[in-house]
Amino acid sequence: MDHLKMELRHWVLSEAKELTNLCNAVDRHYLSDRLPNPYTEKDAEEWLKMVSDNDTITGIYRAIVCDGKLIGSISVEKKDDDAEIGYMLHNDYSNKGIGTEAVKQICPIAFKVLSLEQITANVFQPNIASIRVLLKNGFKYKGTIPNAVIKDGNVYDLLIYVLTKETR
């Protein structure tokens, strides 16, 4: 991470404008279509309210901040005894070890607070950077769902990675 100081922190309801700017600045090529495009301030306000109401109940939701600036988002959302991790970073902060560090910090919190057995990551096949982040954090390749995702006219395999409570 060189000299950058990265931290995960709770979201603040007043950050709708910053969140809107972030969501409209990230590379969406490999992001889920759950994120509206374009992302509006109303979308941000609704999401921040959901996070405020549900943090530590249905998931762990954190802002990724670097040197005091909002640069990304990371969450682990519960689904029964499993949960799915998702993250995004502003393009200017990619390939600096920040994603790896954010995943490293959030997983122990999620296992403890949400009483999880495992955390799953679903990755579009060409997203090598995300695969590297997961492998560096102990996630193991579990399988492939062929032709599972259509995004911007492209068809991608969906790769599944898992981190269990025992193997972390």
Q: Language model features by range: what are they?
A:
Residues M1-H29, A63-R168:
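Acyl-donor (CoA/ACP) binding surface of acyl/acetyltransferases
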Residues R28-K49:
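Conserved GNAT-fold acetyl-CoA-binding loop/helix
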Residues L31-N37, T58-V65:
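A short, aromatic/hydrophobic, helix- or strand-capping loop or linear motif
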Residues L48-M50, N147-A148:
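A generic local structural motif
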